[in-house]
Amino acid sequence: MNRLSCFLLVIGLCIGLSNANLIWNEKNTVFFKSSLGRNNVLKIHCTSEDNLGFHFLRPGETYDFSFHDSIVRSDFYCELWQGPNFKFHASFMAYQGGGLIVHYGKKNFWDAREDGIYFTHGKETPKLEYKWK
């Protein structure tokens, strides 16, 4: 197998294993949903090279942001709070990309529930990733 064939095979496998689309200009999106109990507000703060500010979600509400991967790195670090006086907290990398492999149309879904933060790319059932501290 020549080098070009090997390269194309590796690229094809990377695309096939990714949840990204083949639309080359489609932005990546990070979604947040509050599935918390009644009267429990979710506070979200995400940063990368930019500060995306604070967002407050009531149960059932959503917040999302979209972006193109950077050739250098595309990292979005997020902090979430909930409960009385926002005493329960979780912090995590909500999106990591860019660099060697640039994603197009990748989707990360985060769902805040009473027992923690659940994650899915949208194709599978959400799984508990982080517990509240």
Curated annotation (Swiss-Prot):
Primary location: secreted
TM annotation in the entry: none
Gene Ontology, cellular component aspect: extracellular region
Keywords: Secreted, Self-incompatibility, Signal
Signal peptide: 1-20
One BP term from GO: rejection of self pollen
Organism domain of life: Eukaryota
Compartments in which it is found: Secreted
Family designation: Belongs to the plant self-incompatibility (S1) protein family.
Protein name: S-protein homolog 9
Record lineage: Eukaryota, Viridiplantae, Streptophyta, Embryophyta, Tracheophyta
